[in-house]
Regions:
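Short, solvent-exposed polar/charged micro-motifs at secondary-structure junctions
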Residues: 7-8, 90-91, 162-165
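Donor-binding and catalytic core of enzymes assembling or modifying cell-surface/extracellular glycoconjugates
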Residues: 73-160
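Compositionally biased, intrinsically disordered/low-complexity regions enriched for serine, proline
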Residues: 38, 142, 152, 169-170
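Conserved beta-strand scaffold positions in the cores of enzyme catalytic domains, especially
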Residues: 43, 99-100, 152, 175-177
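Leloir-type glycosyltransferase catalytic cores
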Residues: 158-178
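Short linear motifs in intrinsically disordered/low-complexity regions
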Residues: 12, 20, 26, 51, ...
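Secretory-pathway luminal glycosyltransferase catalytic domains
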Residues: 1-72
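Residue-level marker of intrinsically disordered, low-complexity segments enriched
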Residues: 15, 78-79, 100, 174-176
Length: 178
């Protein structure tokens, strides 16, 4: 078993994977009604939860990572924050500007669908983030283009000191790792 966070496992069938993981029309239509309220939204994912108690394996990312990633976009871009700790996100000074909206998603399917409909991504060191961004690259659900040409910003620090995993194949070549 594994997280399969390397497109080298399935690059030869990427279109099929994206098609198979397409969202049900009901969820997709609900998410489209939300996403049209934003102009070129950036998906920003923050994973805390179990990472706070398991930081030796998966450390939560600091606000400095998100600040640096945000600086790679125009300062007026709208950002939708997805997190398992929305209360904490709302308390952070970095996200207090009106351009930030915290998703109060009813479930992970809706959050993943909304993420995949965004124009650009700032991902956490999380399989949920990774898949949300990867599925959007060539999303098969119209009316998205057949090729995703947005930015994906990913953290260089993916694992903690207890896990000495090689991450060279973790990120697609067009993702920006900081």
């Amino acid at each position: 078993w594994g997280f399969f966070q390397s497109e080298k496992y399935f690059d030869h069938i990427a279109f099929q994977i994206r098609d198979d993981f397409g969202f049900k029309d009901e969820i997709l239509n609900e998410c489209r009604k939300v996403i049209v309220q934003f102009d070129k939204p950036i998906s920003l994912h923050i994973r805390r939860g179990d990472f706070l108690t398991n930081s030796g394996n998966h450390p939560p990312l600091g606000l400095d990572y998100y600040e640096k990633a945000l600086s790679m976009f125009e300062s007026d871009r709208q950002v939708i924050i997805f997190s398992d700790d929305t209360k904490w996100c709302k308390e952070q000074k970095l996200f207090e500007d009106d351009r930030f909206a915290v998703s109060e998603g009813s479930d992970q399917f809706h959050d993943m669908c909304l993420m995949s409909l965004c124009d650009d991504f700032i991902i956490a060191n999380s399989s949920f983030s990774w898949w949300g961004a990867w599925l959007a690259k060539n999303i098969c659900n119209p009316p998205r283009p057949t090729y995703f040409d947005g930015k994906v910003i990913a953290p260089k620090k993916w694992f903690g000191p207890n896990l000495n995993h090689d991450t060279k194949d973790l990120f697609p070549p067009d993702w920006i790792v900081i």
